[in-house]
Amino acid sequence: MSNATNNTLGSLLPQLEAAANSNSLYGGMVPNLRFNITMIVIWGILLTIHVVQLLMRQYWFSIAFICTGILEVLGFIGRTWSHSNVADMDAFLLNMICLTIAPVFTMGGIYYQLAKLIEVYGHRFSLLPSPMAYSFIFICSDIVSLVVQAVGGGLCGVAVTDGTSTTTGNHVFIAGLAIQVASMAIFLMLWFHFLFRIYISVRWEHINSRPISLSLLKISQTEVDYLYREKFHFLRLEPKRWVFHYFNLAITVAVLTIFTRCCYRLAELVVGWDGYLITHEWYFIILDALMMAIATVTLTIFHPGFAFKGRSTSIPITPGHVDPETLPHTDDVEDILDTSDSKQFDIEKEEFQASMKYPISTFKQFMSKIANLFSSKKKAKL
């Protein structure tokens, strides 16, 4: 087995010990065959749709959603496999690893959409100085979360080898999930702050008053659009563009459902591997499988490629602290924000690579150090 598999196996040892009497890795519960096959079909359809959307719209960050689809399909294949043999370690690990990691990719895509929306509405609505900072900070946070979970798994593995308690490793593993939940909670606050600024604050600015009243709803988006960034008014005002008009609501639904799922996973581990949550599949069906399905179906209907007009419109994320609205020369702005159709895919690809370069290199360094640490301990024992 690889180091990653060994680490993950180590983190699951408390469950193995608790379920030893029933010879089941699911605490005595047997995954429902019909449900898990149904989920394989549903996720297979969603995965196919996102691949087609990527090819049609050339929207580079669709790859994040495709990765989620692949992991979900593999995860439910693992659960289907486990139905016939609940003691099969390979099937159990395929399920646990894939379904645990899958939401990270969806959230990575969502972080990037906030940066795009800040460019569409204007930098003044952003709490952070740079739109790309949202992607950078929260993608790094998710990677740190995965690293901490790997460390927890490694500690459990070493503890079992030494014949000591796995409690510390299990606590570290739970801490990794807690970091993910805390990171998403912070992102939710920043997201709702952004929504407050573009929907409430602009109306206060428009009427030069700050009433807290339903009368604000009578002010249409068209009336306040002059307070947004002029360059992308065509995205916001075109009457037939219902996908963009409801895009912010779609992102909100997706984030809240994924956040619910992550809270469930954290509670599941806190209660224990042999606890009530993990041994009753209905909790998994409603709070994990259904939540992820709702999030992905929502992002499939309100796909960013449709919301931002795919390759026909370029919305590059402004680097650093530069606000294009404050640049003195229009020509300079156009040079920085080149909207030629032929460059859209390359721009998206470069931004994706730029946002992931440092987080991935940091993740590799962490994992290398962890592998060396546990490898040296094993050699010392020999």
UniProtKB/Swiss-Prot annotation:
Membrane topology: Multi-pass membrane protein
Known role: Catalyzes the ATP-dependent translocation of sphingoid long-chain bases (LCBs) from the cytoplasmic site toward the extracytoplasmic side of the membrane (flip-flop). Involved in the establishment of the functional lipid asymmetry of the plasma membrane. Regulates intracellular levels of LCBs, sphingolipid precursors that are growth inhibitory at increased levels.
Outcome reported for the amino acid change (mutating residue 3 to Q): Increases sensitivity towards LCBs
Induction line: In response to loss of mitochondrial DNA in a transcription factor PDR3-dependent manner. Induced in response to altered glycerophospholipid asymmetry of the plasma membrane in a transcription factor PDR1-dependent manner.
Broad class of the protein's primary localization: membrane
Alphabetical list of InterPro entries matching this protein: RTA1 (IPR007568)
Transmembrane segments: 35-55, 58-78, 91-111, 136-156, 172-192, 242-262, 282-302
Single GO molecular function: long-chain fatty acid transmembrane transporter activity
Cytoplasmic side: 56-57, 112-135, 193-241, 303-382
Top-level lineage group: Eukaryota
Signal peptide, first to last residue: none
Keywords: Cell membrane, Glycoprotein, Lipid transport, Membrane, Transmembrane, Transmembrane helix, Transport
Protein's UniProt name: Sphingoid long-chain base transporter RSB1
Family per record: Belongs to the lipid-translocating exporter (LTE) (TC 9.A.26.1) family.
Annotated glycosylation sites: 3, 6
Alphabetical GO biological process terms: phospholipid translocation; sphingoid long-chain base transport
Topological region Extracellular: 1-34, 79-90, 157-171, 263-281
Subcellular localization(s) per the UniProt record: Cell membrane
GO cellular component annotations of the record: cell periphery; endoplasmic reticulum; fungal-type vacuole; membrane; plasma membrane
